[in-house]
Amino acid sequence: MYKTALFYDDHQEKRKKIILVILLLLLLFGIYKNGLQYLSNNLVLKTDIFKLFLYPIISFIGVLGYSLLKKEKITIDNACEAIILALLVPPRFPLIIYSIIIFGYFLLKSFNYKCIEAISLIVIYKVILILVGSIIHLNNLNLVELNHSYHYGILNNFFGYSVGDLGTTNIVLIIILLITMCSSFYYKKELVFYLLLPFFIWQVINVLLLKELNTTLLQSTYFFASILIAPLNGKSPGSKKEIIIFGLGISLL
C-alpha cells in the first residue's frame, strides 16, 4: 500500500489529526473563496457551490472503494489523501472527467507498482489534471473570476484570495501546515528549502531591481506541492547531494 513518509510513524497520531484539520480548513476556505463568498451578491448559483463540495465527496468515494477492495479500514492517512486530491483540482474542472481520473488514480494505486510509488502517484495525478486542463482549455479561474477582472494584492495572495486550484491558494494556512510537518522526523525539510529557494531569490531580485514583489509567484500551486508531494514521498531523494540537485532542478523547471 502506498503511504507517504510522514505517516510511517504510528506514534504521531496527534500530529496526523492536526494536519487533517489544516487540510480541511484549506478545503473549506477554497469552497468559500471559489463560491460561497459570491452567493450573497448572486454572482453564483447554489448548484455551482454544490459542485465544489462534490470534488471531495468523489475523492472520498474513491478512498472508500479502494479500502473495500483491499479490505482495509479507512484511516486518517486515507482521509488526508482524499482531501489533498480535492485540493489540487481546478475549481471549474468537469465532474465526469474528475471522477474518471479519481477512478484511475485508485486503480493504479491498487496495483502498487514500484515505479509509480517512486514518482509519487499524487504527482502523476496532478500532471494528468494539468494535461487534461490544457486539452479542454481550462484554467484555474473560478466562475466569477472568469467573467470579471480582478487585481489581487500581496495580502490577498497570502490569505488565499488569488487564482489557483480549489484549495491551494491560502499561503498562511500552508505555512502553518509546513511548521506542523517540520516536527516530523521523516519529513524532508531540506528538500522543501531547496524547492523554494529559487522562488525566494527571484523575489529578492524583483524587490531590488523592480521595487515590487512578484505576486504571480504567490498565486502558484507550487508552494502547496513543494511541501506536500516530494518531501512526503518515501522514494524521493534522501542524501544531501540528491536533495540539492532534485530540489533546485524541479523548482527551476
Task: Show which residues each predicted segment covers.
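N-terminal signal-anchor module of multipass membrane proteins
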Residues: 1-64
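C-terminal transmembrane helix-loop-helix hairpin of multi-pass membrane proteins
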Residues: 8-21, 158-167, 194, 202-253
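Small-residue-rich segments of transmembrane alpha-helices in multi-pass membrane proteins
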Residues: 24, 79-91, 122-137, 197-207, ...
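Transmembrane alpha-helix boundary signature
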Residues: 31-40, 64-73, 90-97, 115-119, ...
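Structural signature of hydrophobic alpha-helical transmembrane segments
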Residues: 41-57, 91-100, 157-171, 211-223
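Central hydrophobic cores of alpha-helical transmembrane segments in multi-pass inner-membrane proteins
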Residues: 51-67, 82-83, 101-110
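Cytoplasmic-side transmembrane-helix entry/capping segments in multi-pass membrane proteins
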Residues: 72-81, 97-100, 116-127, 189-198, ...
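Long hydrophobic alpha-helical segments that form multi-pass transmembrane helix bundles
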Residues: 113-178
